[in-house]
Amino acid sequence: MKSKLSILMIGFALSVLLAACGSNDAKEEKTDTGSKTEATASEGEELYQQSCVGCHGKDLEGVSGPNLQEVGGKYDEHKIESIIKNGRGNMPKGLVDDNEAAVIAKWLSEKK
């Protein structure tokens, strides 16, 4: 009986130890407040540099994609966001997620 209790105690102790040492891979949930105005210009520019610069150029001058230097004078923020999300011409859809598309669109809409 004593050996069974010892085995149970060791098993329990190991379980507790493993649980305490386990990694916490839980991802933080992003809370979307629904406000696109909270995005700063630097966030929009940073996302552009990460995802768009290859086709539209460092200074929005256009490379294989069109020039975007005055895109805000041609399209409003919602149209720009729609193009980013759904693609157009040679630009495929889904290059960025919806939240990133909104941030980039807000930033680009100010380019007039």
From Swiss-Prot:
Induction: Induced during exponential growth. Repressed by glucose. It comes from Bacillus subtilis (strain 168). GO terms for molecular function: electron transfer activity; heme binding; iron ion binding. GO terms for cellular component: plasma membrane. A lipid is attached at C21 (S-diacylglycerol cysteine). Present in very low amounts in the cell. The keyword Metal-binding applies. A lipid is attached at C21 (N-palmitoyl cysteine). It is a lipid-anchor. Residues 1-20 form the signal peptide. Residues 39-112 form the Cytochrome c domain. Electron carrier protein. This is Cytochrome c-551. Heme c binds at C52, C55, H56, M91. Coiled coil: none annotated. It is found in: Cell membrane. Residues 25-44 are annotated as: Disordered. The gene is cccB. Residues 25-35 have a biased composition (Basic and acidic residues). Keywords: Cell membrane, Electron transport, Heme, Iron, Lipoprotein, Membrane, Metal-binding, Palmitate, Signal, Transport.
